Curated annotation (Swiss-Prot):
Monomer. It is found in: Cytoplasm. GO terms for cellular component: cytosol. It comes from Moorella thermoacetica (strain ATCC 39073 / JCM 9320). Binds 1 Mg(2+) ion per subunit. The gene is aroK. Its main location: cytoplasm. ATP binds at G12, S13, G14, K15, T16, T17, R118. Pathway: Metabolic intermediate biosynthesis; chorismate biosynthesis; chorismate from D-erythrose 4-phosphate and phosphoenolpyruvate: step 5/7. Its cofactor is Mg(2+). It catalyses: shikimate + ATP = 3-phosphoshikimate + ADP + H(+). This is Shikimate kinase.
Amino acid sequence: MPGNIVLIGFMGSGKTTVGRLLARDLGWSFLDTDTMVEERLGLPVKEIFAREGEEFFREVEKEAVARVATARQAVIATGGGAVLCGVNVKLLREGNKVVWLQVRPETALKRAGLDDSRPLLQGREPRDIAALLRRREPYYAFADIYIDTDGKEAAAVAREIKEALKAWLESLT
């Protein structure tokens, strides 16, 4: 039984930032599947999408998810689209607590839209982001816990996750 905390959610929801803080607070390791893909291929996500396309990226991402699924006491930040693959969902759920970091489209665009490393946000209007987020929401709904990140500092979100998972965390010790 792995016993990890898996953070899922749309781009700009705070998975990486919150994940690092939460891992530090818990004394756990932090794993980021996007970073793992970048390290494996030696390219940033944006270039992987541009050169090879999203389908290729998702295949390599699936390998990264399979690797993190065997971790123990780690906080895992997934790419925003990792949950589009049923195999990933199965691996991420098994023995772990999955937390959906929810974000409004406007907030996602403000947090991540200016970052040119986000290929699916490039050149998008707020209504496009809202439509993409709506299409993805059903894929995030399997999470054990939903946390709204709008208007909150990352440290407050990390504390909220710890509090929501308090009994589960105590059961691991």
